[in-house]
């Protein structure tokens, strides 16, 4: 995996990952990481990516890993950062794949970048905060409620929450915990404090971005879109996936009974195969 630092005109740096620099014969798939994670593409999918002809691209969102923080960032502004990344790499069109909050960033990018996006696959994506008809907090675990309600009260309140010493309990299901004993135990190498060497700005700004206007219209997504969600997800409950499916013109929803926030990734490889099928 090639890693580079992309210097932007505003002085910020984005830390970028590319599995096959300059290989235009592969389908570029941009990975959008979860909260809080590094942006390195998912190792558990590398083998499948090889036989599917995938070129993995990723980047640490601002405030994570080697990327400069950008307080006040939105889904749309991160989509603009993605544009700078793919332009710098010489990539014209590409597919998007995102997990958890990263799924929402993938959807935002698809809305902003339009025809450059060939397909989108998300796993446990979160719906917009102003989603009409959705009880946004319903079904969330207590730690998630506290964290996101702090973000909804403003960035200063979110900073106080994250620096108060409060512990986050994800309340993973048995199916989720079993995933850590297999290939997706990889998440432990990129999540949590490992993704925030310079402090919690990435986490703070992710959560704040979920509860403000996204700056893009999801109805403008033209790429075929796969939404995967587990019915037992207490971090981002499955009604978020249902709402997205009902409001995205090109979306297909796969609901998985009994799966939670991590265990839904058991279907990530089939999601990658779906992307390949959509793009030819």
Region roles according to the model:
Residues 137-216:
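Alpha/beta-hydrolase
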């Amino acid at each position: 995996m090639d890693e580079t630092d992309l210097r932007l005109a505003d002085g910020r740096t984005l830390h970028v990952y590319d599995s096959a620099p300059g290989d235009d014969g592969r389908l570029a798939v941009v990975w959008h990481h979860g909260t809080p994670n590094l942006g390195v593409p998912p190792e558990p999918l590398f083998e499948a990516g090889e036989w599917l002809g995938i070129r993995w691209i990723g980047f640490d969102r601002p405030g994570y890993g080697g990327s400069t923080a950008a307080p006040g960032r939105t889904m749309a502004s991160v989509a603009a950062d993605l544009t700078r990344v793919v332009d710098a790499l010489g990539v014209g069109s590409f597919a998007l794949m995102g997990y958890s909050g990263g799924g929402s960033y993938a959807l935002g990018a698809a809305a902003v970048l339009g025809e450059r996006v060939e397909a989108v696959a998300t796993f446990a994506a979160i719906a917009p905060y102003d989603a009409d008809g959705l009880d946004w907090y319903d079904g969330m675990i207590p730690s998630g409620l506290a964290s996101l309600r702090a973000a909804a009260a403003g960035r200063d309140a979110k900073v106080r929450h994250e620096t108060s010493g409060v512990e986050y309990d994800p309340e993973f299901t048995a199916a989720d915990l079993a995933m850590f004993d297999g290939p997706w135990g990889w998440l432990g190498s990129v999540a949590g404090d490992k993704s925030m060497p310079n402090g919690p700005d990435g986490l703070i700004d992710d959560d704040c971005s979920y509860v403000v206007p996204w700056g893009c219209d999801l109805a403008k997504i033209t790429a075929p879109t796969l939404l995967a969600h587990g019915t037992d997800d207490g971090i981002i409950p499955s009604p978020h996936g249902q709402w997205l499916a009902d409001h995205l013109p090109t979306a297909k929803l796969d609901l998985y009974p009994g799966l939670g926030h991590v265990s839904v990734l058991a279907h990530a490889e089939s999601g990658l195969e779906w992307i390949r099928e959509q793009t030819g």
